[in-house]
Amino acid sequence: MANLLVIHGPNLNLLGTREPKYYGSITLEAINSNLTHQAAQAGHHLTCFQANAEHILIEQIHSAAHQDIAFIIINPAAFTHTSIALRDALAAVAIPFIEVHLSNVHRREAFRRHSYFSDIAEGVISGLGPTGYELALQAVFARLLPP
């Protein structure tokens, strides 16, 4: 059994009502419930965390290093394009992570096309809606298998 962490960045608490054109109508609670169930079925423990403040997300990442977290799935949301501090926190704890985005950031405004995380992530999934989280979780399961 592995301990896994899903981190959701700013404004993702508004899923279900926020710009459904880009983010769909599913709620964050529904995404978290689905992921938690899938992880439990695979024999893993999954914790989901959301915050709108950068420093709170950083503190969560720092504490992951002391909680035996084997893998992180993160949707940094708007911090993708702005937060060197969040990137540095992920690099500092050296826990492998997959970057997820609900919308296809490459089909949106130009400023959304740059990520401070992609080059240090194990992988990036963008534009597949909530299915992107599920695919990231499946990739995590595959990486946790013994060689």
Curated annotation (Swiss-Prot):
Active site: 23 (proton acceptor), 101 (proton donor)
UniProt xrefs under InterPro entries: DHquinase_II, DHquinase_II_CS, DHquinase_II_sf
Xref: Pfam families: DHquinase_II
Swiss-Prot/TrEMBL GO biological process terms: amino acid biosynthetic process; aromatic amino acid family biosynthetic process; chorismate biosynthetic process; quinate catabolic process
Coiled coil region boundaries: none
Pathway(s): Metabolic intermediate biosynthesis; chorismate biosynthesis; chorismate from D-erythrose 4-phosphate and phosphoenolpyruvate: step 3/7
Gene3D superfamilies in alphabetical order: Dehydroquinase, class II
Annotated site residues (Transition state stabilizer) in this chain: 18
EC category: lyase
Domain of life: Bacteria
Function: Catalyzes a trans-dehydration via an enolate intermediate.
Family to which this protein belongs: Belongs to the type-II 3-dehydroquinase family.
Name listed for the protein in its UniProt record: 3-dehydroquinate dehydratase
Organism: Nitrosococcus oceani (strain ATCC 19707 / BCRC 17464 / JCM 30415 / NCIMB 11848 / C-107)
Lineage of the organism: Bacteria, Pseudomonadati, Pseudomonadota, Gammaproteobacteria, Chromatiales
